[in-house]
Amino acid sequence: MKKILVVVTSHDRLGGTPEQTGLWLEEFAACYHCFIDSGFTVTVASPEGGGVPIDPKSLEGRFPDRESRKFLAERNPALDNAERLSAVDPGDFAALFYPGGHGPMWDLANDRCNARIVSGFFARNKPVGALCHGAAAEPFPVASFPEPELT
């Protein structure tokens, strides 16, 4: 069975403010269910490992969409005990995905283990994807891009 690595934030504050943030649940849950329904095994990892902070705004008002509500109703443990990024081997996975939320801008964007992981995926020509603020977590290594060809 093919495995997908989903890298999420460990950061729970909006910058240095007291305002809570973290993973935007909808951006995780919709993709998580899609991956599982497509026959993939999903491994969740974060810089600190353990419980993943969920942005409380993603649980308010109109935001908990159908996939988020399904994820919560299942009492799914996927976000309860993320693996530490330092323990992850990119060679073990077929693809890498970063869901959003504001947290990745503070921890993943500058995390050396994250840079090692995404570089490993690029070096192996494996797919890397991101949704919304998850793109801030992809410190694209310059060396992984070929020289442009001029014709």
At which residue positions do the language-model features occur?
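Extended, subdomain-level signal for the structured scaffold at the beginning of enzyme domains
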Residues: 1-124, 137-151
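Short, thiol/selenol-centered motifs that function as redox-active sites or metal-ligating centers
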Residues: 131-135
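Conserved, well-structured core segments that form or line functional sites
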Residues: 127-129
